[in-house]
Regions:
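Nucleotidyltransferase catalytic core that binds NTPs
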Residues: 1-191
Length: 191
């Protein structure tokens, strides 16, 4: 089938989703390069243990994205077992057969791309869209990829979780509604 549309897939643990994630999402939306954008919270990450439950992370994504015209997929959260990009790509390609899938990945994760589960098969299904961060070095790869430069915000979910647990202020790193959700649910040691 000829693929006449372009669909960006932005997956992540989103533990929690923060303004850095939203900055990338808004850049993708403003670029007008994609007919659709699907945000996919990871269900059971292969490389790290999520702190918040999958349901809380999904709800924070829903809250953060608000009325943006974006699809939020719960396919990984509903799938039992470890979440792998290949399984998600297969499922989303079946649901979007006329779309070329573009897998959004940060330059830090792209540096480790050769270690991903079934990477050769994944690379046949998607084109990687690498988000270059200031100061990052991207090595040449045999996988189809394109690069976008975004002035990334210096925010990390790990830093946010550690700051909450340590009682430090993090309001400037999160959308206000996500911060309220975290406080209300007592996530990451907040009270």
């Amino acid at each position: 089938m000829i693929k006449t549309k372009n669909c960006a897939i932005f997956g992540g643990t989103f533990d929690p989703i923060h303004l850095g994630h939203l900055h990338v999402i808004d850049h993708l939306l403003k670029s007008k390069k994609f007919d659709s954008l699907i945000v996919v919270p990871t269900g059971n990450p292969a490389t790290r243990q999520a702190v918040a439950s999958p349901q809380d992370r999904l709800e924070m994504v829903r809250i953060a994205l608000g009325n943006r015209e974006i699809e939020i997929s719960d396919c990984e959260i509903n799938r039992p077992g470890t979440s792998y990009a290949i399984d998600t790509a297969i499922e989303l390609q079946q649901k979007n057969p006329d779309s070329q899938l573009h897998w959004v990945v940060g330059s830090d994760a792209f540096a480790q791309i050769s270690s991903w589960h079934k990477i050769e098969e994944l690379a046949e299904l998607v084109e990687f869209l690498v988000v270059e961060r200031p100061g990052s070095k991207i090595s040449a790869t045999k996988f189809k990829s394109d690069y976008i430069k975004i002035d990334a915000l210096p925010i990390s979910a790990t830093e946010i979780r550690n700051s909450i647990n340590g009682g430090l202020a993090i309001e400037e790193m999160l959308p206000a509604n996500v911060y309220a959700y975290i406080k209300n649910k007592g996530l990451y040691g907040s009270s």
